[in-house]
């Protein structure tokens, strides 16, 4: 499903470059990206299609993290607010980093939040004229630590610095 989601991201990037505002693209396609990630599981009858429709309806916990994502009853409003933030923010790097961080902070789905957030970040970066960022396997712990600090200590600085090192 990762490849199908990647193809959707490429199509989204094309639409943004052709004039669709990036924040509107985020609002329009973030759920589709998530669905595409898990489409092979639906085809294999591992997941019911209904399980991928909309946001999560249950609590979710992140293994190894002290951050507890928002309660399921708050997800819809939080995502609506994130969509508005993405529409209003003009700076591509700010949109990319905040979009990624706030998305994983909310954790709107039961699974696939990190992968979806990285697709969001990259679509915002690429359409802003920056390179696609890949989190190297050997830096995954640093990435997770930076997200943990941002989520638990309300300090996004380390996460911003981490992403900046990947942009160089």
Predicted segments, located by residue:
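FIC/Doc superfamily catalytic core
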Residues: 1-168
């Amino acid at each position: 499903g990762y490849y199908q989601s990647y193809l959707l991201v490429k199509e989204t990037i094309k639409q943004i470059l052709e004039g669709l505002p990036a924040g509107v693209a985020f609002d329009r396609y973030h759920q589709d990206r998530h669905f595409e990630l898990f489409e092979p599981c639906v085809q294999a009858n591992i997941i019911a299609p209904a399980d991928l429709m909309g946001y999560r309806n249950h609590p979710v916990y992140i293994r190894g993290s002290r951050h507890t994502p928002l309660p399921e009853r708050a997800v819809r409003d939080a995502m609506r607010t994130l969509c508005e933030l993405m529409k209003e923010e003009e700076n591509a790097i700010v949109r990319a980093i905040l979009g990624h961080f706030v998305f994983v902070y909310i954790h709107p789905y039961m699974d696939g939040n990190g992968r979806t957030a990285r697709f969001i970040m990259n679509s915002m970066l690429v359409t802003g004229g920056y390179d696609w960022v890949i989190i190297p396997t050997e830096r995954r712990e640093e990435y997770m630590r930076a997200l943990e600090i941002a989520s638990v200590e309300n300090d996004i600085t380390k996460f911003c610095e981490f992403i900046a090192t990947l942009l160089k």
